[in-house]
Structures are given as structure tokens and as C-alpha cells.
């Protein structure tokens, strides 16, 4: 027997930018498809016209490509099972709506929103979970037809609802969660499959699309568990075999332990925000893959090829995945250290230009200087936009030292080191990192001061910071004139404060 051809889909709604949670869904489907040499489908679920954002689908596709996620079929690539936008499939949905109506498995419902809300209020008052109750209960076929014609004559527009069989259990063996089942009386009554504007509801359209596109596995977020029994109702009514379902656990904020919500401003949640900060796509791919999936071994840095080779949905976590910002920064730093320097230069240059620190068209000499600047900070950056704050001393006039910096150098040793180092700088033939380090060693010999008491006063006086890249490289890029100016400012500030 031939092995089943794996077909998965990622089906976003174009309601805004690509969210971390949606990116994870896309990524896991991508890895599953590639691991099994299957097919990944991109489908745009834009049936809810009110929620769609102009350019939303384009933005999401661009960010998926940036992450390194590609697909085999979709609105931009075509395929044998299109169209791949729900808004272009209305006639297809109507065919199956008509089939269910003709078979008596669905019906027109003319209850207004006001009547439905009144019904829900009554149920709440009785302590009953709100649910739809069949509006034609006890009526004959002729009476139902007459009631519908009267409603139609009043200008009321109907929805189409699907009959939910009574006393039935809907169950599936979830790839992540194991066996799950729901009783039909917990679904909420006959639910809408076509809205008043003629567009299908999500739980109907997704079934038709998945079946016709021959989707074999559906990997999606935990929030879709409650949709699955409704979709199984539709599968059963249409006589179709459902795909295998897998529901990934929620992503939580590692600081608060709460579900990652778009209202939680303590965490950046959209891929575009990380792009703007200068995160690398391979690092984001790596980090997101580890949100709820565990590779073999202790290593946490993998190539895309390694992830594809290892990916097994059986290793998807049953516990919520914690979004740890510090871990993301660590992973991105690992990738920055190994990144192509031209890539880092482009990202950092863009960040510096956005901050107004570098002209739009720098000279070749300036570009080479910026390249060296990026190189000395690369090992420290968690993302490239950090260079704007890290390297401000290279672009702005020196400010007075902070109280913490003054505290570090206010003793006699501090002044002695700074004054001697200034003398030694005048003795070096060329202002290069190697020569500068030689001047520091000469200062050590002249003063007898070493270690932190030697290097910290030199760093603070010359770069106006207690931390930073290699001190020799930093001073070389600052240039001798600025370094000496910084030293003079430091000595003046110490004198002004009687230090």
C-alpha cells in the first residue's frame, strides 16, 4: 500500500501583521511537510470582510518568506486546488450549502440578532449555558415553509444552520493532546454555516477547503479545539473523512505565566517588530521552533535543515510554551556572531540612518569606518538596533560622566592612570589598536597599577562607558583627537569635583 502523501496548510486571516503564535503554526506545518516530503498549502481565510486589513495578506506572506518559510501552493503560486483565497470560493461553498439544504441537513433560520440575544439572556437567567434552540420545533414541513415565506416577505435575510444530531459523541485522536471527545449537546445547538451576506462561516468553509484541497493533517493552535467538534459535524453531514488534527499548546509570557495576549505590551509579538530591531531570520526561525517543540539532545542552536530532519509532531509539548525574551536575545546573539558581516553592516547601517546618526549616502571611507564599528560591536549585540545606543559616543559629543563612572575612578590610582595614559599616547607613532594597547601596558609599568584598576579608568576616560568592545579597537575608531578630548574632559570633571 502506497504511503499517504502528506498535505498540510497554513491558513491565516488577513487581519493584521504576522503574530508570533501564527508564525509558529506556519513553521510547524512547514517543518512537518518538509520532513515528510509532503506539500504545504497557503490559504488566505478572508471570508470575514469586516475584519480584513488592506495589505494584510501581502504583509503576512512577506514576513513568512523573511522567516524562511515557503509553500508549494497558494494565491501567489497557484496549484491544482485553487482558488486559494476564501473570498474567491463563494460559488464552491454555495454548492455544498445547497446540498445540505436539499438533503434536509441544514435549514434557513430567520431569527433576528435581537431575538437570539433575548433567548441567550433568558438562558443565562435560568443558569443554562447560552445555546441556539430550534425555532421550528413541533412544526410540520408546510408550517415551516409558511413561516419562512412570511419572514422573507418582511425583508428578513436568513442564515443557514446545520442540524446537530442528538445524543452523538464527536471524538478524535489528537496528535498532541491524545484522545478528545465532545457530546453533541455541548456544541451550542445548530450553528450557522452561512451568514446573512451569503458568505460561509469559518467552521463550514474550513471543512470544504480542507477536503477539496486534500489536506491530510491540520496542525493549529489550542484555541481551535472547541471548533473541531463543529467541523466534525460538517464532515459527517457531507460524508467526508476528516483529516488528522493536532492542537498545539498556548504560548505564555515567561514573566507573568499568562497567555500571550495581543494586549500584553511587555512582549513584542509581531514578526515585523523583530525585523525592525535587527533580529536575524534564521535566529527567529530557531527560537520559534523551540516554542513548544523539543529536539533531541541538549543543543538549542540548529540549522533549518537539522530542524527539518528532526521534526516529529510527537515531540510537541503538552504544556504551554513560555516566550522567554532573554532566550530569544541569546539565540539571536549566537547567530549575529556567526553572521555574514555584509548582512550585519546592512542592518546596522539602516538602524543608524533611522536614528539620524549616519547620512543616507555615506562616503566609501565612512562606510569602511561603519563596517569596523559593526565588527567590534557584533559580539555584544542581541539585535542590531542596539548599536544605536551602544555606539552613541562615536557620533555625539561626550557627556559628563555618570555618578557610577565617577565612583569607579575617583581615587588617586584612577587619576594617576588617566594622566599617565595620556602621556603614553603622545609617544606612540601610529594611533592603532595595537599601539594603543602598548600604551596601556606602558602605563601599567609606569604606575605599577594593573587589572581592573588600570583598565577601567582608561575605558571610562576614553569611551565614557564602563562596558564596551575591545578598548584598543574602540579608541582607534574614535580617533586620537576625540580620545584626548575625552581624557581632558574627564580630568577637568575630576578637578571640578575635587577628586
Swiss-Prot record:
GO terms for biological process: glutamyl-tRNA aminoacylation. A motif ('HIGH' region) lies at residues 12-22. Its main location: cytoplasm. A motif ('KMSKS' region) lies at residues 259-263. It is found in: Cytoplasm. ATP binds at residue 262. PROSITE patterns: AA_TRNA_LIGASE_I. This is Glutamate--tRNA ligase.
